[in-house]
């Protein structure tokens, strides 16, 4: 029997543009994703690739220019301070110092495999873990 995983956080077409006219900067460009209950997610990328901007949109700290965030199957509603506080009780991000997070001499798949194995992922084949 196949295990049915529930989507807890989903983004559709998330885009963030800062500035306007010739000073316009496209920080996040139409990102789609689904995060599932019980899943640990790490967003990695080069400096300036939009990781922090995406995280701030997911947390509701900044609004997307386009796109929607869905939480527990419904369009996220954080229009009031009270609703935002309630949302924040259910979601968390951990921003890390990049120099203390990863060993630059290890390949990223080896670093992520260590994390997966620590969380009980030893039962999955290597290919499934790093896909």
Residue ranges and their predicted role:
Residues 52-53:
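Conserved Walker
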Residues 42, 85-96, 110:
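ABC nucleotide-binding domain signature
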Residues 97, 104-118:
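Q-loop/switch helix immediately C-terminal to the Walker
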Residues 59:
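Helix-to-loop junction immediately C-terminal to a conserved catalytic motif
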Residues 67-77:
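Conserved ABC transporter NBD signature motif
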Residues 5-8, 17-30, 37, 80-83, ...:
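A short, flexible loop at the N-terminus of ABC-type nucleotide-binding domains that lies
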Residues 76-92, 118:
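ABC ATPase NBD coupling module
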């Amino acid at each position: 029997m196949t295990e049915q995983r529930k989507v807890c956080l989903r983004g559709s077409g998330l885009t963030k543009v800062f500035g306007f006219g010739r000073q316009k900067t496209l920080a996040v460009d139409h990102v789609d994703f689904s995060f599932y209950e019980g899943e640990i997610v790490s967003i990695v990328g080069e400096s300036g690739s939009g990781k922090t901007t995406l995280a701030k949109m997911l947390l509701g700290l900044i609004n997307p220019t386009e796109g929607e965030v869905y939480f527990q199957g419904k369009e996220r509603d954080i229009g009031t301070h009270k609703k935002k506080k309630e949302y924040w009780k259910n979601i968390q991000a951990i921003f890390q110092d990049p120099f203390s997070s990863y060993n630059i001499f290890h390949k990223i798949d080896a670093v992520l495999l260590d994390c997966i194995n620590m969380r009980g992922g030893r039962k999955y084949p290597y290919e499934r873990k790093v896909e």
